[in-house]
């Protein structure tokens, strides 16, 4: 058991490492791709050589980021087979479909048109080149769609049926998987956060060049485009985040409770805006969960259910199976103890089904199919030793959520301010306080990355211990490998990905420092 725990923890750590490194490149690809396409559209409309130079500058940075992002993403898909082979077998028919479409359709689409985008200047018509640029940007979004649909299915399994004869889940509705509320909100929330990062990146880099008194006209134009895309992105990110909260409240109430550090729910539940958790607080005790808190009255009920008087269950309520309607009447839900018992019944029925199949007992198989279907939705709970095993890391989820919301709120104010200054203060670089604004813009780049990664920490840590919500826990999904193997590959990936990140930053900084946009004006 100890070795299993070590393997699970190290495999989770390895996947978190590679996923976070990969995510450092993905949102910039999503956001910068759209910005470059818009800039080239302006160039084609105006025929201005200055817009051409500006387009090529940002396109160069896009290409550097895209190349490193592809390199970091390849390893992720292989990890499902090496470290999580039971999961791959259990849901491969479903989970593999969107990933296969992403690889065959979206990635090849990006790879084909990015070649035209970079090497087609002067070789294809301007309109065809613009089309290639837009298709590259759209291809990146389509690529994200399939990956995010797969991730959403892990958190809210729909559109499938379990086949006890093959011990695998089989797809019955592809559209249900792709169009589930969880998938739709996750896609738009993630892509719009990429637009936000792309906009902030353009504004921040432009402000760095303004600090150096270089390429002033180009930077001021870039700031306008970046600020518009960033503002649209952050507003839509917040809007889709609201929808995501509702789906989480419905399908993953334990995650919502962990996000709030909420142990005992109430009708008209307050939302903790700022708070410090009590590290001594345990499930079932009477200690105050917070050392300090500033709350918004009824905010969590509004966020979770769009109803200020609705009941939001806490961790103790969810474990005990307690809930209440808006009029205060108790609503029966299934306690975690009962879920564990039903999970064991499903597990036992599966074993008996396998034995009946070997003996050719079709009558027993028919009866066992009914039992399996009755309890299958709780199969994952069979692997839990106690109900508390289903509680995610509360401090990490709680604080990550507040980091995400806090920085996101700052970015909204910053981008709106940037838009105002870009149009009302056309000679922004000459203002006496401009240096402070430029430095704030530069600092906003890493802050946006922290915000983005924090969102993924909430999404992934908050759903633990499930790799497939309620159906399969991490311990059930793990491959039969040694902890030493995972530790070795973890160290290799850590060194490799760190080297790639350093290379990416170094190349980008070198290009930003040395590239004079005027030198690109006459480039064809």
Role assignments for model-derived ranges:
Residues 1-20, 47-54, 78-100, 152-188, ...:
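Membrane-interface interhelical loops and short amphipathic "cap" helices
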Residues 2-45, 53-57, 62-69:
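N-terminal signal-anchor module of multipass membrane proteins
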Residues 46-64, 90-96, 100, 120-138, ...:
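Membrane-interfacial loop-to-helix junctions in multi-pass inner-membrane proteins
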Residues 63-71, 134-154, 230-241, 356, ...:
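Hydrophobic alpha-helical membrane-insertion segments
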Residues 65-135, 152, 461-463:
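Membrane-interface helix-loop-helix modules in multi-pass inner-membrane proteins
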Residues 115-123, 128-134, 145-154, 174, ...:
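Internal alpha-helical transmembrane segments
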Residues 150, 232-348:
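Aromatic-rich transmembrane-lumenal/periplasmic boundary elements in polytopic membrane proteins
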Residues 389-456, 487-511:
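C-terminal substrate/ligand-recognition segments
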